[in-house]
Amino acid sequence: MAAGTAFAVDHAQIAQTGDTMFKGYLEPEQAKDYFAEAEKTSIVQQFAQKVPMGTTGQKIPHWVGDVSAQWIGEGDMKPITKGNMTSQTIAPHKIATIFVASAETVRANPANYLGTMRTKVATAFAMAFDGAAMHGTDSPFPTYIGQTTKAISIADTTGATTVYDQVAVNGLSLLVNDGKKWTHTLLDDITEPILNGAKDQNGRPLFIESTYGEAASPFRSGRIVARPTILSDHVVEGTTVGFMGDFSQLIWGQIGGLSFDVTDQATLNLGTVESPNFVSLWQHNLVAVRVEAEYAFHCNDAEAFVALTNVVSGGGEG
């Protein structure tokens, strides 16, 4: 079909069959499960605890006091203990987007555009979730990992100090001296040059990659000092290149999966709130796909984490 004149080819917001990106492609193949793609891509979801989530959220009980016992002699009065508990309430928040295509694009589906867009949207949701969980980026959640006040540099290895010393000695000391644990590690891909030359006390590579892994996995998994570790491309924020700590302090949940709604009857604003540009889908033979998901996340104790940075002595970056 000949291209229309209402919307230019290669429109910034609407996919059409005449777009340059669709030229020369064969018939598409069946796409895969899209929410599994989101779970697979999110690295925080790999280590955090997943909890059931209702539409109004969840109230999570949490013990904050220890139950005690004492040795006693015959006939002695037995001690009394109570312990203490509190609760955390986590609520789901919605994330959404809409993508628009011409009806002709929907029918022809060049280069499996629709299937690819669904996967890309799922990935975008996962990236937004990780950014909120790690750094509080555009986050509706009140807590996130980066609220920790603990930090150690894995790039500042002057003198006899090694990456092993910084992570397994200095970083771990910050945790255990505060009564915390080290269960997992998240690192950005930009730390790979640092890790490649790093050894443990026995001269073995500090980062030991998993023997078996998916060839198409969006992240690399392995271990650092026996702790499960993930390297991915979206951990870095400023000078922070990773986190180590107790990931059992993180919980997340979802309501259902990704929700897809398709319509050709609505009116969309292709502009902004301040400068609207309303377009009738029906009048212009367009189709809109609305994608929504509801996630909840809570970091119970940010001080159970150490931010790993690339800051070197003198204020620079490694």
Swiss-Prot record:
The keyword Ribonucleoprotein does not apply. Keywords: Capsid protein, Virion. It comes from the Viruses. It is found in: Virion. GO terms for cellular component: viral capsid. It holds the Pfam family Phage_capsid. The keyword Ion transport does not apply. NCBIfam families: major_cap_HK97. Belongs to the L5likevirus major capsid protein gp17 family. This is Probable major capsid protein gp17. It comes from Mycobacterium phage D29.
